[in-house]
A protein has these predicted regions:
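N-terminal positioning helix adjacent to the helix-turn-helix/winged-helix DNA-binding module
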Residues: 75-78, 86-90, 121
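DNA major-groove recognition helices of helix-turn-helix
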Residues: 114, 118-132
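Helix-turn-helix DNA-binding module
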Residues: 100-117
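Short alpha-helical segments used as structural interaction elements across diverse proteins
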Residues: 73, 94, 117-121
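N-terminal interaction/assembly modules
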Residues: 1-82, 106, 133-134
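Short amphipathic alpha helix immediately N-terminal
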Residues: 85-102
Length: 134
């Protein structure tokens, strides 16, 4: 695994957590819109099979979302621990890129470096991470 692949693990884990959250919210919205019954007629108190299945599906989506969030937290901490010890501008560039998930343009503004300057620093920082991963 290269240094860049290692550092990008958090971005991927965060993306997966957002996907699971969106799926959960979509399912919740669908259940809410389908389960409304406003015809005024009594329907009994038994939970119907479709309602039970929908609740189980929703619970499964919620569990997947929470597990993905926990994974993202674990991966973020692992990446953060690697970056934390890197001093100077190299550490700051890595932190902004791989922990705060900033775009290159935002990093240039934050550290007051040109695009090329930030990429040179990033290249040096990746070499430091690569040496620590071995």
């Amino acid at each position: 695994m290269t240094a860049k692949e290692f550092l990008r693990q958090y971005e991927e884990a965060e993306r997966k957590a957002r996907q699971h959250k969106a799926e959960y919210e979509r399912e919740l919205e669908m259940i809410g819109s389908v389960s409304l019954n406003m015809d005024g007629m009594p329907h009994g108190s038994n939970i119907s099979k479709p309602t039970e299945e929908a609740a189980l599906k929703l619970a499964d989506k919620a569990l997947r979302w929470k597990m993905a969030e926990l994974d993202a937290i674990r991966v973020r901490q692992m990446v953060y621990d690697t970056i934390y010890d890197i001093k100077g501008i190299e550490g700051q560039v890595l932190y902004e890129r791989y922990i705060n998930l900033h775009k290159w343009e935002e990093i240039c503004v934050l550290v007051h470096y040109s695009w090329q300057g930030v990429h040179k620093v990033h290249k040096r920082a990746l070499a430091i991470v690569e040496s620590r991963l071995k």
